[in-house]
Structure formats: C-alpha cells, structure tokens
Amino acid sequence: MPHVEIKCFPGRTEEQKIKCAEEVTKAIAGTMGCNESSVSVDIKEVAQDDWKDQVWDKEILPLENLYKKPGYTCE
C-alpha cells in the first residue's frame, strides 16, 4: 500500500518509465508517510485510438471526485 497505476499513450522509453516510477514512488512515500518499499507503480500503455473507450469513458468521466482532473476532454 499504496499502489499507483499510470496509463499513457505508447512511445515512452523504458528509461522514462523507470524514472517516472521512481519519482512517483518518492512523491507518494513523502506525502503519504510510508516507506518507498511499500509503494508499487504500474505503467500501462493505451493506444491513442483506444483512450476514449478504455480510459476516458470508463475511468475518468464517471469519477466525480478525482483529486486531479485532466485539462482536456474526449468529446
């Protein structure tokens, strides 16, 4: 605990994904008061053509209480 799942378009290098996971781990541990060893991070790539159906419509749009909302829409 805690577990973070990041979804993004394809195209990031493995090095970028590792760096992202490291930085997210530091931020989570620092702000939530847990050890870095308690944090897990998963990065899933979603094709841009699938983003609206797989992510926006199912995981972003229905959530009224997102702590950070995106600055875009998929209308």
Task: Report each predicted region and the residues it spans.
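A domain-level signal for the structural core that forms small-molecule/cofactor-binding pockets
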Residues: 2-75
